[in-house]
Design a protein with these regions (language model features):
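C-terminal helical cap(s) of enzyme catalytic domains, especially alpha/beta-barrels
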Residues: 110-130
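Acidic/histidine-rich catalytic cores of soluble enzymes
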Residues: 1-80, 133
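Terminal-tail/helix-coil boundary detector
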Residues: 126-153
Length: 153
């Protein structure tokens, strides 16, 4: 990606649609990529995958059956992508755009994947806090109320 940015002179339109499943299948750190390039992420595909190498099949395992591949796409939550961390890092980076279900799975039916997909994404969307939990500490206190709560008055 850095070569692309170099060749485009870091053009502001040189942005991307982030898809953690492809990073996982390439054995790249999909979480670190968010940290490195969050300002370039303008869309997100919510898609899961798993990488299961064996003594016979790996990254360059040749053509295998859909379910026999070392790297394969899975329904959301059935693969190895840590979506809690993905959504947390995106939220912390200020991402506020689309999170689109992209589905392929070599095990489940499309109907089951679709039925599970929207609730899965909704469960991972993070509403950002408007205040810190300890913001109250900078405010004043009501001594009378505190004494009543403690049973001292």
């Amino acid at each position: 990606y850095e070569m692309f940015l170099d060749y485009s002179d870091n053009h502001p339109a040189a942005c991307l649609n982030y898809d953690p499943s492809h990073f996982l299948l390439q054995q790249l750190d999909y979480l670190d990529f968010i940290r490195l390039y969050s300002e370039r992420i303008k869309g997100v595909h919510v898609k899961d995958a798993e990488f299961r190498p064996t003594g016979r099949v790996g990254v360059y395992g040749g053509y295998q059956s859909w379910s026999g591949r070392a790297g394969r796409f899975r329904s959301l939550g059935d693969g190895q992508v840590d979506f809690t961390r993905v959504f947390t890092l995106l939220t912390e980076a200020g991402y506020n755009s689309w999170a689109v279900l992209e589905w392929e799975c070599c095990v489940k039916s499309p109907e089951q994947g679709a039925a599970e997909g929207a609730p899965f994404i909704a469960k991972h969307i993070i509403e950002t806090a408007d205040v810190a939990f300890d913001d109250f500490a900078g405010g004043g206190t009501d001594q009378t109320q505190n004494r009543q709560i403690l049973g001292l008055s």
